[in-house]
């Protein structure tokens, strides 16, 4: 060990003695440039002139380089050169190669891609301009010329004056004096080839491609630059937009050309604004933002596909270039000479001149034919020769590594153009990262790992501690198994109390647990003679807050069996597993006997489906007894305690609360209908409601006197969102409901579990569009779209008692057509339907979504592996009903979305609302609970509200958790009581810094969320991005600049959103704060 420290000290001493010259910079051609204050190249901290240079350099496909002022977007200078792409190969029609139609797609770095019409595949050909030139020379049929050339030109950065040029012929003219302004270097790499007829000298075909690179002489190349604005690109449109950190436009400029490269010079640094980064593209920036909000890995782009006057071209990313180069090197050399046994020279006349220009040339055909032989399209065609195969979806072959390639479908294409006319451009994103497979290390690697642990004292101690722990666990397990009855009788009193508690939380229709079956089997009970009624549970007694009488399901007496059959006598020979299964089936079968009645159906009349999401459906129902309307939430529960405890959490929390600022709870019960009973009841119920709504819609439309063919909305009787929604799944049937996410690969068959925002979008058609369409057209996300409910259970605001099926409709619906045959929404200014029509159609859409219960599927994801199972295969389930106070069919989130002006948000009213929320939180905290998911979507308006006085109520307590007393560090109710809460639950946009860091947290997380909600009430954000960035600043501890617009509220909001929880006020201190008085 001492030798190690001696060597380390010697190395550090050596490094300290080595001189370091920070004033020298080197450029690519090894010319040393000395930094100084006078030459304007590098502005050091010690120089007097320290103004930051901010210039944007753009290169377009027509060969024009433009310099823009980074502060204003005004053009500083412009330099024109030859186009980067030209020639007959780049503007040719499809070529017929042996019966295969190929469309050539050249790349700017001199390679050729092909689009094969037969296989609908885009892939690189194993050929470049260099190999094409070599092949045509070897064939000797044409006179060819071409090659690669590199030209470097130096320009004054500020004036655009050309100082010098260096090419293959010469370099000059030089300047003996040191320039006063920085010099920008523009390097152009050109690959060109021309083929001519040897007799007539007529050009047959040609191709020229070029790339442009920009560097700063004496400057520093940096991958990322720190700037006050962000540059966004619309490459096909030639538009550059500068936005601030709140995504507000600073300036916008059109450079009149298809943009292929952009650089930014800031100070003495230069960095490329890559067109392969989706965050730099105007149309894909929101998708990147969404992936960050959902903690998903950002996809990078391998290729950029664009068109020039309607003809395609490709730009390869540096990664794609390197991968393709290594892959092509592994292919065998094209044996071009051996393919042509009898070369023929082509004659030239007026017709052949035209044909030559259309790439009708035998030499080129031969070269392309040999290249095509090695393509995947050729292999696909060979396999499908025997029969006619259906046309495949478009796919793009991109090299993943030097030895493999990946197929990229249209779902990974992103449009970069806003304009619907002119040329187009698409980013070709990499496929989603695959799950890392287990890999067995080689023996050498394994031995190295073992020795690294042997010589690491910490690792040895950890290994021994783990070994001792495993040994103790094994010994304890053996002792426990050797005397199960002794351990069972040690605490008979505790066991009786546990059994009593278990009785209180089950209904008569629940099947016995595995432990109970195990006890019956071990005690040798005769399952054939055990009466079903002997295994009976006491029903769940709801906590009453009204005089409504509770009822239990009637006990069904089993038929007495007088004769014992042969099957009964053979049960003694059954195995333990068979006895368990038999007992469970017989217990479950009691619910199939005649006489079952639904308490919900007997006591309530459903008026409307007002919400759905996660695992629940919320009905607006009228009590037959007192004729009052309530919000009744129904949740499907699997046959196990863990699932029941999860869904009972909200009911148990609500039962403890009695506060005007919290949704009121009345009572709850459970039902366990026979298999298929609930599905049939839902079908009848929803069909009846739909018929009533259709009749209402017919009457409304009948009264309308004018319609426009171009502005009409599709008839509501065809409006179905069933392809994008399924009945909520059963709680407890997912493998890991806390950590799994779901998706609908086939919406008409698979009903995915949704987040709050996704469910809301589905209600008004936003989710009907396919993923590819949304991403391709890059529709801007609505204000609620960036929110992702990463809840540990599936309660969402859509299940809350006032969630309206149409409450999340945007005020300005965008025009699009549903891909699933749903309602077609048109622009709000042209919509001839009134609000009543819209509302009725939304309700019908929800009903039709719920009506596909029998086709519902459960989609589970664990470690990115999809598992799809039919709902009916998940086992029997019970239904938990929670009766709650009915609120207005709008949330605070809906109000915020509609109230965009400051006039609609008087500060006095906003203060009153914040005070109401603080009062509700104070009550929760005093009761020892933390809400953990406070957001506008979980705040509702009471039906007792008036125009002058709105009463707010906090709802959706599915994530509310009990605290452990004085420290108020949250503890999971369904886990060990010593486990501190660090789980990342709630909505990410409204999480506190300690939640985002997975640290221990207290009730102060609700105060932080309240601060964000207060900010959203006081400040009217112009865009969703502005709100996201503001909240992100709060979560990072930065002070958002937008607070300067509300100086009277600034200190109050900063107190609530303090980075340190101890510095945030309590809910009582917020409610009594002088700012709110």
UniProtKB/Swiss-Prot annotation:
Record PTM text: Autophosphorylated. N-glycosylated.
EC number(s) recorded for this UniProt protein: 2.7.11.1
Listed Acidic residues bias regions: 783-796
Transmembrane segments: 454-474
Cellular-component GO terms for this entry: cytoplasm; endoplasmic reticulum membrane; nucleus
Enzyme class, spelled out: transferase
Protein name in the entry: Eukaryotic translation initiation factor 2-alpha kinase pek-1
Induction: By ER stress.
Compositionally biased region (Polar residues): 732-746
Domain notes: The lumenal domain senses perturbations in protein folding in the ER, probably through reversible interaction with HSPA5/BIP.
Annotated organism of origin: Caenorhabditis elegans
Composition skew (Basic and acidic residues), residue ranges: 766-778
Gene name of the encoded protein: pek-1
Location relative to the cell: Endoplasmic reticulum membrane
Family: Belongs to the protein kinase superfamily. Ser/Thr protein kinase family. GCN2 subfamily.
Glycosylation sites: 206
Chief location of this protein within or outside the cell: endoplasmic reticulum
Binding site for ATP: 610-618, 633
Free-text tissue specificity from the UniProt record: Expressed in intestinal cells.
Record's subunit section: Forms dimers with HSPA5/BIP in resting cells. Oligomerizes in ER-stressed cells.
Domain Protein kinase as annotated: residue spans: 604-1076
């Amino acid at each position: 060990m001492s030798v190690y420290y001696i060597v380390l000290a010697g190395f550090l001493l050596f490094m300290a003695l080595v001189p370091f010259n920070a004033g020298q910079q080197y450029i690519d051609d090894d010319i040393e440039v000395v930094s100084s204050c006078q030459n304007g190249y590098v502005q050091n901290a010690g120089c007097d002139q320290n103004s930051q240079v901010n210039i944007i350099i753009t290169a377009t496909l027509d060969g024009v380089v433009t310099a823009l002022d980074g502060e204003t977007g005004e053009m500083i200078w412009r330099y024109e050169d030859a186009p980067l792409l030209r020639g007959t190969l780049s503007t040719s029609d499809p070529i017929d190669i042996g019966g295969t139609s190929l469309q050539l797609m050249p790349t700017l770095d001199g390679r050729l891609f092909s689009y094969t019409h037969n296989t609908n595949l885009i892939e690189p050909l194993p050929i470049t301009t260099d190999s094409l030139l070599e092949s045509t020379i070897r064939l000797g049929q044409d006179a060819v010329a071409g090659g690669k050339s590199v030209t470097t030109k130096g320009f004054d950065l500020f004036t655009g004056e050309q100082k010098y040029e260096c090419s293959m012929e010469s370099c000059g003219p030089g300047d003996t004096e040191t320039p006063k302004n920085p010099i920008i270097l523009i390097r152009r790499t050109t690959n060109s080839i021309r083929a001519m007829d040897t007799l007539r000298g007529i050009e047959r075909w040609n191709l020229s491609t070029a790339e442009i690179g920009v560097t700063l002489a004496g400057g520093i190349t940096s991958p990322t630059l720190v700037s006050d604005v962000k540059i966004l690109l619309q490459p096909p449109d030639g538009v550059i937009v500068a936005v601030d950190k709140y995504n507000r436009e600073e300036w916008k400029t059109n450079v009149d050309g298809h943009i292929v490269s952009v650089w930014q010079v800031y100070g003495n640094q230069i960095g490329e604004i890559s067109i392969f980064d989706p965050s730099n593209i105007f149309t894909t920036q929101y998708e990147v933002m969404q992936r960050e909000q959902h903690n998903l890995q950002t996809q990078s782009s391998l290729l950029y596909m664009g068109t020039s006057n309607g003809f395609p071209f490709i730009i390869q990313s540096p990664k794609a270039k390197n991968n393709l180069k290594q892959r092509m090197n592994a292919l065998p050399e094209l044996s071009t000479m051996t393919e042509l046994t009898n070369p023929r020279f082509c004659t030239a006349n007026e017709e052949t001149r035209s044909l030559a220009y259309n790439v009708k040339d035998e030499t080129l055909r031969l070269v392309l034919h040999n290249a095509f032989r090695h393509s995947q399209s050729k292999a696909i065609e060979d396999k499908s020769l025997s029969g006619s195969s259906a046309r495949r979806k478009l796919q793009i072959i991109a090299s993943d590594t030097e030895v493999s390639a990946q197929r990229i479908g249209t779902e990974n294409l992103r449009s970069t153009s806003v304009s619907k006319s002119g040329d187009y451009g698409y980013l070709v994103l990499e496929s989603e990262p695959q799950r890392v497979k287990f890999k067995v290390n080689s023996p050498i690697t394994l031995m190295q790992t073992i020795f690294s642990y042997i010589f690491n004292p910490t690792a040895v101690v950890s290994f021994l501690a783990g070994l001792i722990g495993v040994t103790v666990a094994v010994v304890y397990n053996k002792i426990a198994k050797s005397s199960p009855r002794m351990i069972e009788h040690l605490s008979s009193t505790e066991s009786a109390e546990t059994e009593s508690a278990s009785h209180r939380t089950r209904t008569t229709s629940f099947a016995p647990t595995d432990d109970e079956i195990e006890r019956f089997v071990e005690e040798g009970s005769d399952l054939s003679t055990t009466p079903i009624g002997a295994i009976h549970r006491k029903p769940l007694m709801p906590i009453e807050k009204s005089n409504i009488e509770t009822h239990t399901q009637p006990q069904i007496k089993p038929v007495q069996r007088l004769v014992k059959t042969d099957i009964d006598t053979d049960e003694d020979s059954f195995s333990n597993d068979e006895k368990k299964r038999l007992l469970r089936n017989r217990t479950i079968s009691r619910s199939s006997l005649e006489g079952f009645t639904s308490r919900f159906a007997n006591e309530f009349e459903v008026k409307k489906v007002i919400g759905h999401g996660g695992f629940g459906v919320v009905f607006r129902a009228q009590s037959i007894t007192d004729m009052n309307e309530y919000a009744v939430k129904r949740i499907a529960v699997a046959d196990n305690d863990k699932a029941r405890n999860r869904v009972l959490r909200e009911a148990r929390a609500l039962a403890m609360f009695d506060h005007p600022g919290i949704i009121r709870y009345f009572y709850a019960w459970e039902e366990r209908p026979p298999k298929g009973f609930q599905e049939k009841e839902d079908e009848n119920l929803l069909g009846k409601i739909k018929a009533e709504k259709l009749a209402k819609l017919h009457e409304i439309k009948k009264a309308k006197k004018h319609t426009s063919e171009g502005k009409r909305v599709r008839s509501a009787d065809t409006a179905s969102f069933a392809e994008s929604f399924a009945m909520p799944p059963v709680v407890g049937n997912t493998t890991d409901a806390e950590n799994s996410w779901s998706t609908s690969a086939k919406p008409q068959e698979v009903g995915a579990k949704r987040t709050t925002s996704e469910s809301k979008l589905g209600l008004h058609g936003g989710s009907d569009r396919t993923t590819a369409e949304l991403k391709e057209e890059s529709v801007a996300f609505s204000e609620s779209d960036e929110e992702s409910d990463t809840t540990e259970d599936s309660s969402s605001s859509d299940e809350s008692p006032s969630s309206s099926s149409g409450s999340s409709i945007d005020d300005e619906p965008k025009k699009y057509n549903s891909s699933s045959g749903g309602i077609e929404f048109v622009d709000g200014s042209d919509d001839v339907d009134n609000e009543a029509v819209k509302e009725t159609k939304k309700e019908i859409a929800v009903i039709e979504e719920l009506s596909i219960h029998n086709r519902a599927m459960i989609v589970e994801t664990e470690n990115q592996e999809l598992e799809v199972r039919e709902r009916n295969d998940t086992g029997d389930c019970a239904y938990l009903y929670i009766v709650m106070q009915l609120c207005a069919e709008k949330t605070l989130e809906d109000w915020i979305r509609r109230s965009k002006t400051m006039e609609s948000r008087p500060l006095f009213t906003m203060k009153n609302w914040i005070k109401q929320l603080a009062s509700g939180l104070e009550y929760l905290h005093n009761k020892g609970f933390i809400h953990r998911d406070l957001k506008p979507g979980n705040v509702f308006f009471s039906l007792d509200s008036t125009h002058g006085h709105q009463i707010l109520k906090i709802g959706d307590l599915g994530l509310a958790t009990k605290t452990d007393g004085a420290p108020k560090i949250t503890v999971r109710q369904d886990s060990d009581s010593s486990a501190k809460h660090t789980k990342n639950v709630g909505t990410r946009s409204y999480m506190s810094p300690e939640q985002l860091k997975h640290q221990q947290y207290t009730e102060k997380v609700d105060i932080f969320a309240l601060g964000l909600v207060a900010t959203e009430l006081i400040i009217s954000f112009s865009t969703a991005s502005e709100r996201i960035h503001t909240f992100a600043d709060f979560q990072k501890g930065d002070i958002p600049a937008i607070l300067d617009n509300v100086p009277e509220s600034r200190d109050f909001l900063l107190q609530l959103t303090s980075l340190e929880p101890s510095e945030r006020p309590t809910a009582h201190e917020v409610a009594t704060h002088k700012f709110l008085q």
